[in-house]
Amino acid sequence: MNTSILAILFLIQCVFTLGLHFHPLDPLTPQEINKTSFIVKKSHLGNLKDLTFHYLDLEEPNKSHVLQWLSPNPSKKPPPPRRRSFVVVRAGGQTYELIIDLTTSKIASSRIYTGHGFPSFTFIELFKASKLPLTYPPFKKSILDRSLNISEVSCIPFTVGWYGETTTRRELKASCFYRDGSVNVFTRPIEGITVTIDVDSMQVIKYSDRFRKPIPDKEGNDFRTKHRPFPFFCNVSDTGFKILGNRVKWANWKFHVGFTARAGVTISTASVLDPRTKRFRRVMYRGHVSETFVPYMDPTYEWYYRTFMDIGEFGFGRSAVNLQPLIDCPQNAAFLDGHVAGPDGTAQKMTNVMCVFEKNGYGASFRHTEINVPGQVITSGEAEISLVVRMVATLGNYDYIVDWEFKKNGAIRVGVDLTGVLEVKATSYTSNDQITENVYGTLVAKNTIAVNHDHYLTYYLDLDVDGNGNSLVKAKLKTVRVTEVNKTSSRRKSYWTVVKETAKTEADGRVRLGSDPVELLIVNPNKKTKIGNTVGYRLIPEHLQATSLLTDDDYPELRAGYTKYPVWVTAYDRSERWAGGFYSDRSRGDDGLAVWSSRNREIENKDIVMWYNVGFHHIPYQEDFPVMPTLHGGFTLRPSNFFDNDPLIG
């Protein structure tokens, strides 16, 4: 198609879109994705060998421009930010970064990336790598020597991390499994074989077959339920919410929901209605899962490298699954699609990857019974109804159910449920009584050891509490002895009081939880309630969060230093969104949250970002096999002196 005709068609599409609930942070449309790839392919890169698209997303517009455009004052509203896309492609063994101006149909910038690390793998690369061992003669011989049928073998490629190599290439290591009629592939490993693959050349570059172990029995490992599933009801007859484009309105909330190949669901420009002023007030500019880290605790040759950073290496959104009505989401849910770029740059539709629904919490959002009014018993309350935005990502053996839940009291509850199947290794042991060595896990079935591991989900939370100028306040609870002065009127010997400390720099913004009682608040020191309290939101963890137990000099820890603290607060920078660095695969720890925080920038009364790690140390148990019941984690962002009184009362 002629470039000028394409530009005209795109302009028409943009004008149409702007008239239908446009938002500057809307994900790229299929037309914008295809236009981007068309421009890249028509450039000098189109002539290079094996041009492959690894990242194609909206180039984040300037935050101040977005906020001005969203201003309710028409006289201050500038033109919408220009739509631009950011692209990462591989061609001829090199990584290229481009910014495409979708209005002018021109490349605004282009450079070759020469730093450490590589972009995420495409599903085509992963598929080819999974099939490669099956055609490799030494592997075929190993399977034959084990008297196995190669048609029943499945291989799964894993990322390899970084372990001090001075030069690296794009590699995967494939582990293989023997189905033999079983659908629970991960429970039947063919132990002892490791296949190392050069992804760019798609060739086996190293092969080892070190030992053999009996393959675990397939009997009893089926994860499919034998019970008829109960329908998923919420007892909320009406939807109660409106979705206008990517904008969602419900009760006293309005926000923008998006979907990207890397982060999956994103929540932006979330504002809550003040019942006194009848105006919406800002709470969060941007929120999404930034990175995951799943290191396994087996240092042996076949396992040591399994330290996955799934979002940067594979993509949370790209791994999102089609949500199943009445299983993943209730009958009153609205389902939303996402669009991502395929390896060839063309738009791919991902159907029903998000759902939005009202949830009945089967409890009270508030209640009270008063018996001290003469002759009366007065009871009042309100049922807990909230709004949930949900997605599910399946990354290999694990499924992550991610919820953003908005409450009428002004709180945002962020939850993640871990489920799926364990990653196991084969063993000759059939009883725990036989084990006399460190097996780095738990015997969960005969010949089956589930390996110890961690899960960390790092959330990016660009909170704008009533504006951009925010601070981190640590409200520390301190025990105080009753003084001699008070002893004349009190029999008490002690009490606790609150001592508030405001973090000055990013070093102060690195916080460990659990040792001393403290509440963490993001406040706006420039805004106060009618009676003079500083407005804010506080962080409420749902359980004691795990932090990394790896030593600082261990290579996985160098790459994932952001897991050393559950809470980080940094100065806002538009380019700092991915906790493990943008190029996670084979990264060396020279980019990412820990590096940014080490700059020790000022964070008092600044535009700041909170990062929160939902962390688990997972010691496997037999009840986790053959499929793991959901394990919940999360946190709540709750208004704290943000309103003049309880917003549920008004």
UniProtKB/Swiss-Prot annotation:
Disruption phenotype: Impaired sensitivity to jasmonic acid (MeJA). One of its GO terms (molecular function) is copper ion binding. Its EC number is 1.4.3.21. Mn(2+) binds at D462, D464, D607, I608. Pfam families: Cu_amine_oxid, Cu_amine_oxidN2, Cu_amine_oxidN3. Its cofactor is L-topaquinone; Cu cation; Zn(2+); Mn(2+). Induction: Induced by jasmonic acid (MeJA) in vascular tissues, especially at the transition and elongation zones. Its main location: secreted. Cu cation binds at H453, H455, H618. Disulfide bonds join C155-C176, C329-C355. Glycans are attached at N2, N34, N62, N149, N235, N486. Residues 1-19 form the signal peptide. Contains 1 topaquinone per subunit. Binds 1 copper ion per subunit. Can also use zinc ion as cofactor. It catalyses: a primary methyl amine + O2 + H2O = an aldehyde + H2O2 + NH4(+). One of its GO terms (biological process) is amine metabolic process. Expressed in the vascular tissues at the division/differentiation transition zone. The active site is at D310, Y398. Repressed by semi-carbazide, a specific and irreversible inhibitor of copper amine oxidases. Keywords: Apoptosis, Copper, Disulfide bond, Glycoprotein, Jasmonic acid signaling pathway, Manganese, Metal-binding, Oxidoreductase, Secreted, Signal, TPQ. One of its GO terms (cellular component) is extracellular region. It is found in: Secreted. Substrate binds at residues 308-319, 395-400. It comes from the Eukaryota. Topaquinone (TPQ) is generated by copper-dependent autoxidation of a specific tyrosyl residue. Homodimer. This is Primary amine oxidase 1. It comes from Arabidopsis thaliana (Mouse-ear cress).
